């Protein structure tokens, strides 16, 4: 019987000499702005994707020119924390080495650059390195940027949780020296060509991307259940004692293919802080060994758990960790939004959360966000914290410095805008024109769409109710649309699938209500539902729970069985 053929990416990884491929040769070639097909997969492990301007694609084709290739580079910033000095370096790169002249905060607490010509890639990575930043494993079949609730109010508990997130990120980094050799001109050592180069990953790394998050209850801004692996902090008397571990979440799916589906993670039990690395490595290596390497659409950990079964997976993780799970501790998971404006922490320091629409930091007439953050960074003595809602926290401000920081924020349009509850809880992915997977607009259209939502809520007298709204240009789910009370997922230009019924806290998925509809139909549908919600809701009932209770959509209990059913 012939051996089952693996996905193409598996052969590329095996033959890449631990992610080197021919990236260096492709970088040196001035004949094209592109990398080879194989290297386009490998460069993801180095933190960037090849893209082109889709707005110009047809025009350039008519001119017999290759697409206007550029690159999106994503940094690795565990927990989203960087210093003001680092931010100044990040800002300078955006202003001098990218065509977008902007910084994009992501839904995973880091930043990315768009519009990088190939010739500038090495310079950018070297400039980031000078700021003690990198893009290693920000993309690819590895552990991605580790999220951690930025919770600056409970400073001691956050500090402890952040230390775990940082340790997870560092411990599970690829060991290959390919990044240092190609981008930082480190001298190449003789390749050992054995598994000791990557003691955790091996030559073929993971079957697919792997995402981790550390949540600090009651906040669930990191959407912990949407991650492959989650750690929900458990505290006693303000001290971190361990975590409830979750595994098997993930948002991506494919339109029309019912064997693919989003899924929220399962609860596995409580683990002590000292055992976090053992369990993280155990979960990752089970996925490494059991994950599907034949069909990449079924390669995420969520499918591994579904296919092998919860109990079998749990037993194998305990075996590899050498420790058994304890019963999960009772914790309360609550709001997924950010605390906007000034908040005082237990350490008497102040923290200013700034709303950044769709995470895009750019200077526009009347709203010079990029300049404003630059000016704040020049005088700020604390740190900058990126949130998973694509916002920025100016953290650790002394009381005597508040007025100066606030003055700069207001001067540059970072503060003072009218912000509804729903807009403050809503996010969108980048989509067009740069993302090659996008089928419809997201970031460019989303502010206008939220204007319509705000108007409908005002019409029905429900503006005080925060509703989690998310939009993506495709079903890959970068803005976690399947965990939104109202999720819009691009199907074609100007057309979206409308999903309803997720819980406000992020503990239940939504379900498709209408397929492939345009703005007018979406708004008409929501107009009717908001009208019903205004008069039929129970006290304190959220919109997502309402749509399930009154039968607009059925609750998704087991995504493998009922997300599509």
UniProtKB/Swiss-Prot annotation:
Gene Ontology terms describing biological process: cysteine biosynthetic process; hydrogen sulfide biosynthetic process; sulfate assimilation
Name assigned to this protein: Sulfite reductase [NADPH] hemoprotein beta-component
Q: How is the subunit organization of this protein annotated in UniProt?
A: Alpha(8)-beta(8). The alpha component is a flavoprotein, the beta component is a hemoprotein.
List residues binding siroheme: 478
Supply the InterPro entries for this chain: CysI, NiRdtase/SiRdtase_haem-b_fer, Nit/Sulf_reduc_fer-like_dom_sf, NO2/SO3_Rdtase_4Fe4S_dom, NO2/SO3_Rdtase_4Fe4S_prot, NO2/SO3_Rdtase_4Fe4S_sf, NO2/SO3_Rdtase_FeS/sirohaem_BS
Q: What is its EC number?
A: 1.8.1.2
- Assigned GO CC terms: sulfite reductase complex (NADPH)
Catalytic activities: hydrogen sulfide + 3 NADP(+) + 3 H2O = sulfite + 3 NADPH + 4 H(+)
Binding of [4Fe-4S] cluster: at which residues?
Answer: 429, 435, 474, 478
Q: Which cofactor does it need?
A: siroheme; [4Fe-4S] cluster
Q: How is the cofactor bound?
A: Binds 1 siroheme per subunit. Binds 1 [4Fe-4S] cluster per subunit.
Query: Which pathway is it part of?
Result: Sulfur metabolism; hydrogen sulfide biosynthesis; hydrogen sulfide from sulfite (NADPH route): step 1/1
Q: Which UniProt keywords apply?
A: 4Fe-4S, Amino-acid biosynthesis, Cysteine biosynthesis, Heme, Iron, Iron-sulfur, Metal-binding, NADP, Oxidoreductase
Under Gene Ontology molecular function, one entry of this record is: sulfite reductase (NADPH) activity
- Top enzyme class, one word, equals oxidoreductase
Q: Which SUPFAM superfamilies match?
A: Nitrite and sulphite reductase 4Fe-4S domain-like (SSF56014), Nitrite/Sulfite reductase N-terminal domain-like (SSF55124)
The keyword 4Fe-4S is assigned to this record:
yes
Q: What does this protein do?
A: Component of the sulfite reductase complex that catalyzes the 6-electron reduction of sulfite to sulfide. This is one of several activities required for the biosynthesis of L-cysteine from sulfate.
* Species in which this protein is naturally found: Shewanella baltica (strain OS223)
The record, for Pfam families, names:
NIR_SIR, NIR_SIR_ferr
Identify the Gene3D superfamilies for this entry. Sulfite Reductase Hemoprotein, domain 1
* Underlying gene: cysI
